[in-house]
From Swiss-Prot:
Catalyzes the dehydration of methylthioribulose-1-phosphate (MTRu-1-P) into 2,3-diketo-5-methylthiopentyl-1-phosphate (DK-MTP-1-P). Pathway: Amino-acid biosynthesis; L-methionine biosynthesis via salvage pathway; L-methionine from S-methyl-5-thio-alpha-D-ribose 1-phosphate: step 2/6. It comes from the Bacteria. Keywords: Amino-acid biosynthesis, Lyase, Metal-binding, Methionine biosynthesis, Zinc. This is Methylthioribulose-1-phosphate dehydratase. Coiled coil: none annotated. It catalyses: 5-(methylsulfanyl)-D-ribulose 1-phosphate = 5-methylsulfanyl-2,3-dioxopentyl phosphate + H2O. Binds 1 zinc ion per subunit. Its cofactor is Zn(2+). Belongs to the aldolase class II family. MtnB subfamily. It comes from Klebsiella pneumoniae (strain 342). One of its GO terms (molecular function) is methylthioribulose 1-phosphate dehydratase activity. It holds the Pfam family Aldolase_II. Zn(2+) binds at H93, H95.
Length: 202
């Protein structure tokens, strides 16, 4: 099953690369193998031309790669998602312009999206009248410290679809490739709408 997910993830990485959502080898993607292991893209690889050989097996509990090769810098964010959400089987971390800029414009720790029909692309959302909260965390080069802050936040407030890193990008996930990809595309559309709304509304 996970082998099929990995093959689907490679196709999704090519789609992400074609969209320009992981420029200059940025971003990282992973699939869960089981409760112990995940497969994560290797550091410094162009996402538009990845193959299955560019993914490393990583232990979820320790962030260690038995192969000795270097996994992506944000490995600890992927393994955190797998520990926090047993239903998550795919994690996508992208560096889109909309996510990067909007996370800097919004000064609070939550981006509240409301009034958009496309909110319904997110799992569990049924109305444009609902408010979709997307947590924003200050960026940190110490990924262990960043992961600890996110874990503390998740103890008291829900992280349902993904989160933003300020001036950095978006991390989102899903139970399978289809859900993760839909939520990435949906959130990216909503971020673009919100940026345009803030530009044009007085």
């Amino acid at each position: 099953m996970w082998q099929e997910r990995l093959a689907q993830l490679v196709t999704t990485c090519h789609w992400i690369g074609a969209k320009g959502w992981a420029p200059a080898t940025g971003g990282n993607m992973s699939v869960r193998q089981d409760d112990t292991w995940c497969w994560l893209s290797e550091s410094g690889r162009d996402k538009g031309s990845l193959t299955t050989e560019d993914f490393l097996q990583v232990e979820i509990a320790t962030n260690q790669a038995p192969s000795g090769r270097k996994p992506s810098a944000e490995t600890g964010l992927h393994t955190l998602v797998y520990r926090l959400f047993p239903e998550a089987n795919v994690v996508l971390h992208v560096h889109t312009v909309n996510a990067t800029v909007l996370s800097r414009i919004e000064k609070s720790d939550t981006l509240a999206l409301q009034g958009y029909e496309m909110q319904k692309t997110l799992s569990g959302q049924h109305s444009h009248l609902d408010t979709v909260p997307v947590a924003i965390f200050d960026n940190d080069q110490d990924i262990d410290a960043l992961a600890a802050r996110i874990a503390d936040y998740a103890q008291t407030r829900p992280l349902r679809y993904g989160f933003l890193l300020r001036g950095h990008g978006l991390t989102c996930w899903g139970k399978d490739i289809q859900e993760a990809r839909r939520q990435l595309e949906g959130l990216e559309f909503l971020f673009e709408c919100e940026l345009m709304r803030r530009r044009y509304e007085p």
